[in-house]
Amino acid sequence: MTEKFGADLIVDSLINHKVDYVFGIPGAKIDRVFDTLEDKGPQLIVARHEQNAAFMAQGIGRITGEPGVVIATSGPGASNLATGLVTATAEGDPVLALAGQVKRADLLKRAHQSMDNAALFKPITKYSVEVQDGNTLSEIIANAYRHAKSGMPGASFISIPQDVVDSQVHVKAIKPLTDPQLGSSSVADINYLAQAIKNAVLPVLLLGNGASSAKVTASIRQLLEQVQLPVVETFQGAGIVSRELEEVTFFGRVGLFRNQPGDMLLKKSDLVIAIGYDPIEYEARNWNAEISARVIVIDVEPAEIDTYFQPERELIGDIANTLDLLLPAINGYQLPEGSREYLQVLRDKMDGDVKFDRSQTETGRLHPLDIVEVLQENTTDDMTVTVDVGTHYIWMARYFKSYEPRHLLFSNGMQTLGVALPWAISAALVRPNTKIISVSGDGGFLFSAQELETAVRLQLPIIHLIWNDGHYNMVEFQEEMKYGRSSGVDFGPVDFVKYAESFGAKGFRATSPAELTQLLQKALKENGPVIIDVPVDYKDSSTLGETILPDEFY
C-alpha cells in the first residue's frame, strides 16, 4: 500500500470539494502540500505576496459563491494573509486559508517562525483552528469549508504544523456532504410582508450583497417584472437590477453619499424591505437617522440590531424561495398614483445630478467623468470590472452602471487598498471568455502591482486603468475639507508605461478622452495584460466630497 501523508489528505480534500485553483506562496513548513499539488491538482497559482493571494481567493469567493483557497507558510507567510482574510470576512466572501506552522514540539517555544496562528486569525475569520493529528485534516477542512460558505459567508483559517503535514495518515479524504438547504421563511411571515406591501404607500427594496447571487437575483428580477417596486442597491449589490428593469425600478446606489435619490427614497418610504442587506456597506444611521423607518428584513440569518436598525419582522430562510412565494401574494399590486409621481420627480433629480465644468480640466489630464464615460461606452454587460479604493472608487460607484450581479466589484466593507488587480486575476480565471477591466489609483495600484507578473505569466486578458494624480487623493481632499490643508498624501512619479513593459505587459498612456477611447479599444484586442496610465484632474473631488456623509470620511 502506498504511503499517504498529511499533504495527500489536504489535497485530496480540496479535490473532493471541487476546488479548481489554489493561490499561494510555498515555504518549508508547508512545501509538501505544494509538491503534492504538482501531481494531483488543483491548479496552483503562485502569487508574489500572500496578501494578494488571499485577495485572489476572495475574488473567487465573491464571484462564484464557493470558497477560494489560499495557502501560505508559517510566520510572516501566515500573518501576511491577515488583510485579505479580514476583508473577505467583513465583505461576506467565502475563503479557505491554510497556513504552515512549526512542529508541534516547538509550538510553545521561542522557535523560528513560531506564533499562535489560530489565535491571530480568530477575531477576523468565522473559523480558526490548528490541527494536532494528521488523520483529522480532512474533517477539519470539510468543516472549515462549510463554515466559510454558510450563513453570512467569510473566511476560515486552518493552521497546520509541519510534522502534521509530513505525518503518515490512514484515513481517506471526506467527500463533502450535500449542503443543507434552507426552506423559505414561514408562510405567516410571507403573508405579513405581503399585506404590509399592499398597505404601504411607498414600499422600497434595499438590495445588498446578500441578494447578489445568481439564484436570488433571478427571483428578484422575476418579482420586479410583475410588481414594479422601486429599488435601491448598495455598492456590492450592483447589477442586481437588469438593464431592462432599470428605467422603471432603479433609483441608484447608496453608500458614502448623502442626499442622493436613493437616500431620499429610503427616507420617504413607509416600508423598507431590506434583502441581503449588510450594515457594514451602508450603516442604517445614514439612511435612518430619524429612527423612523419601518423595516422588514429578508435574509438567511437574523440581523444585527442597533438603534437605527430595528426591523419589525425578519423573514429568515432561503431568500430566493421566500421571494418566489411572496410574488403570487402581491401580484397585481401597483404603487399609488401619488407615489408614481414622486418617483418621476426623483428620477429627474437623478438625471440632473451634480454638475461639473469639464471645460476647465487641466490640459493633458482627464476629468473623472470622461474616464467613466469611455469605460461605459466600451464595456459590455458580461465584462467584469474590479475597482480598488480611492477617489476613483467614489466616481465609479456613483456613475458607472452595471447590469449583472457580481460583475462590478468593490471593497465596501473594509475599503481595502490593492484589491483590484488580484480580483481581476480571479475573474479572468473563472470567466475566461471575457475581457476583465480593473481600475485603481496610482496609490492603490502599488499595493499589489507586483501581481502584474502573475497576470503576464498566466497571459490573462486584463486591462488595468490607473487614475494617476500623484497623491493619495481620497485622503487629500478629505483632509482639505476638514483642516484646510493636506498632509502625508504626496509621493513621487512612476512611469507606469515602462513599469508595465518591464513585466512583459503592454503599457499605454492616455491624455485625452479621444486617446483613452482609442487605447482602450486597442487594449481590448490584445491577448495579455495591458496597463493604461490615465493622468486625472481631481479638481472636482471637493465638489463631489460635499455630498459625502461627514462620518463616512476614511
What does each model-identified segment do?
Residues 4, 134, 187, 362-369, ...:
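Short, solvent-exposed loop/helix junctions and linker helices
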Residues 24-27, 115, 390, 490, ...:
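Alpha-helix N-cap/helix-start motif at coil-to-helix transitions, marked by capping-box chemistry
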Residues 208-212, 360, 441-443:
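Conserved short loop/turn motifs at secondary-structure junctions
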Residues 135, 291-393, 513-522, 526-554:
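Phosphate/pyrophosphate-binding active-site segments
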Residues 107-113, 243-244, 306-308, 314-316, ...:
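Thiamine diphosphate
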